[in-house]
Design a protein with these regions (language model features):
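Sec-dependent bacterial lipoprotein signal peptides
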Residues: 1-15
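N-terminal targeting sequences that direct proteins away from the cytosol to non-cytosolic compartments
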Residues: 2, 17-230
Length: 230
């Protein structure tokens, strides 16, 4: 019989993380916390429609959480304040309005002054053009920033993993899985593994289980729930 292996993630509360420690010492370490975004924007745009659009996009609630948390913690600075450690932040979005520009575009750069870093520059000929562009490309803009955060997490987990739990998963299910540091093995059976990471004010964990595949009925919602509840 084939066996179905399922991994489930349970996040009780999203917890803040320390500033990312770069894995490459050739550049300065990027500043800031995960999912923190520096927006370099003139006062006129920030207090107008452009600022409203930026806040609506990047501080929108994260879907499916049991409490309201923004996608990004947005910190706005002016061009004058964009110096020193601020310029070394991990996530940066620059807003530029120039009437001489013919179209609205976004440029993406990586590791400009620090590592790991993403710098996005959104520029257009007018506030109206920027607002229109933001409305049409909001998902792509969020995706680029979220992907940068995920790539950093994957890189860190590959370098600083959890050999004990990774070995248990390989032995039990025959699959390789990268597990972050901090997790402990809460339970292990021939077809079940539960790992968790406890914080002072939050709990994070996942479980993996398998059961025999006996046809399409084994993949119905009822079958999945029944196997999970064993």
């Amino acid at each position: 019989l084939f066996r179905i292996t399922i991994a489930a993630l349970n996040v009780a509360t999203a917890a803040g993380c320390d500033a990312f420690k770069t894995l490459n010492n050739s550049k300065k370490s990027a500043q800031g916390k995960p999912y923190e975004l520096i927006v370099v924007c003139p006062q006129a745009e920030w207090t107008g429609e452009v600022g409203d659009s930026l806040r609506a996009i990047f501080t929108a609630p994260v879907p499916y959480l049991n409490q309201i948390e923004p996608i990004f913690d947005v910190l706005r600075v002016t061009e004058r304040g964009f110096t020193g450690m601020v310029a070394d932040h991990r996530n940066i979005l620059k807003i530029l309005v120039d009437p001489e520009l013919k179209e609205t575009t976004t440029a993406v750069q990586y590791d400009v002054t620090s590592d790991p870093q993403i710098v996005m520059t959104l520029q257009g000929p007018s506030d109206g053009a920027l607002v229109k562009y933001l409305s049409e490309n909001r998902e792509n803009l969020v995706y680029a920033l979220e992907k940068a955060e995920r790539d950093r997490a994957v890189k860190a987990n590959e370098t600083y993993g959890n050999p004990g739990i990774e070995s248990a998963i390989l032995k039990t299910f025959g699959v390789e899985m990268k597990v972050p540091k901090g997790y402990t093995l809460a339970a292990q059976k021939p077809d079940f593994i539960w790992a968790r990471n406890e914080y002072p004010t939050a709990s994070q964990g996942f479980f993996i289980y398998s059961y025999p595949y006996e046809g399409k009925q084994s993949l119905t919602e009822e079958a999945l729930v029944a196997a999970r509840n064993k």
